[in-house]
Amino acid sequence: MKLLSGLLLCSLVLGVSSQRWFSFIGEATQGAWDMWRAYSDMREANYINADKYFHARGNYDAAQRGPGGVWAAKVISDAREDLQRLMGHGAEDSMADQAANEWGRSGKDPNHFRPKGLPDKY
């Protein structure tokens, strides 16, 4: 746990560079909330073939917050995919999820992954 905390702190320090700390931390917090909201919506929707859309949407929304949001989205996405791989989920699906994550983080429209019939609420 100490190692993970240390790596997270180092990643934060390196990610900030000359950014103002409070701005970066605020963006990261809001970005993490955006990721949580997309995950919650995915669970609520429980819609077949919609996971890539929610991955892209969460990363997109977080990245719109600024560099802190991009950092939070990358850390959360990478940690989630690493955990999925450790639990034995397929590497192909993980790679597809990461592609959707990167798509959203780069500012591209997450609706590219939106499945037909997904309620407008999402």
From Swiss-Prot:
Biological process, per Gene Ontology: acute-phase response
Main location: secreted
Tissue specificity of this protein: Detected in liver.
InterPro entries (UniProt xref): Serum_amyloid_A, Synovial_Prolif_Regulator
Keyword check for Zinc: no
Keyword Secreted found: yes
Region of interest: Disordered: 87-122
Keywords, ordered alphabetically: Acute phase, Amyloid, HDL, Heparin-binding, Secreted, Signal
Compositionally biased residues, Basic and acidic residues: 105-122
Localization of this protein: Secreted
GO annotations of cellular component type: high-density lipoprotein particle
Record note on quaternary structure: Homohexamer; dimer of trimers. Can form amyloid fibrils after partial proteolysis; the native, undenatured protein does not form amyloid fibrils (in vitro). Apolipoprotein of the HDL complex. Binds to heparin.
PANTHER family listed in its UniProt record: SERUM AMYLOID A, SERUM AMYLOID A PROTEIN
Family: Belongs to the SAA family.
Name the record gives this protein: Serum amyloid A-1 protein
Organism of derivation: Oryctolagus cuniculus
Gene assigned in the entry: SAA1
